[in-house]
Amino acid sequence: MRTKAVLLLATAIWMHVFAADATDVERIRLQSRDAVLEVTPALGGRVLAFGLAGHPSLINIGDPVASQPNPAVSATADDIGYLGHDVWLGPQSGWWSDQQVNAARHDARAVWPPDPYLAFAQTRVVARAPDRLVLEGIDSPVTGVRLLKSFAFDPADPATLELSALARNIRDRPVSRDLWFNTRTSAAIRVYVPVATDADVRIEAAEAMAPAWRSDAGVFAFLPPSTAGASRRGKVLMQPSAGWMAGFAHRQAFVIRFDLQPRSAIHPQQGQVELYLDHGEDIAAGLLEMEVHAPYRTLAPGEAMRASERWTVLAYDGADTPQAHLAFLCRRLQLCAVSTAD
């Protein structure tokens, strides 16, 4: 599901503290009273850093951000492990089956790499302020859309950032897609997702590599590997019971909120929340993707669809246990109870 270009995990920059390399891509910094965001208009308009001011970034990026800042944009391009946060179009099974610019990938119904026009192209800065940024991408002949991405701190809550993506159909015929947010973090982050039952969780992984997990009191969480040095690689697809997920790392609580959707609105091959986990013996050098799918829709020519996430980051100085983490979420953000979407 991921190529070796993505799996540059040992060299992924987990402890990045909002400092650019001389050969790095351009970075635009947005800042509120509490938090800092860094976005590059290169690489499709990608988030490179987010966290509390003066703290390590919660976003994982790869060495190619500095070593390959100007990738070629073409229908034959392969994936490059920039990581960060970006936006894909789902479902994955349709990435190359509805295009005419790469026959080999079309005929193979390829599910990798992601659309290079969305992932690699330079975007245009449409609006910019100290706490707000809007970027417009280019027309993609692969997915048939153009993306408009917006980032803005909430003036009423300086710990919260709203991210939105608008996809417009640029073709002269309908296209069927969903908007898919993908936020890369370290595999060492302690992540939680509310689920009503275990039946709302499915695993895609080889049995020997499948991540261990449990749901307790309506919340999904990964379990530590049962043996030292164990490697894990796989995807968890979930129908959440509430519109949030959260992670804890580096004395920060990172909460992603979104509009909860009924199962029927999400493409059946996907989950509204997906977690992709990949790590070897050094878990902190591994990768966790925190992913959210918006409803699957058919767009008429020229029609657009929009989806958004709200990111909140708070200082956390409690114990590194699930009980303490969940108590903090309930106390500080009222993320306590779960409900069924269907």
For the regions a protein language model found, what residue spans apply to each?
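Bacterial N-terminal signal peptides
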Residues: 6-16
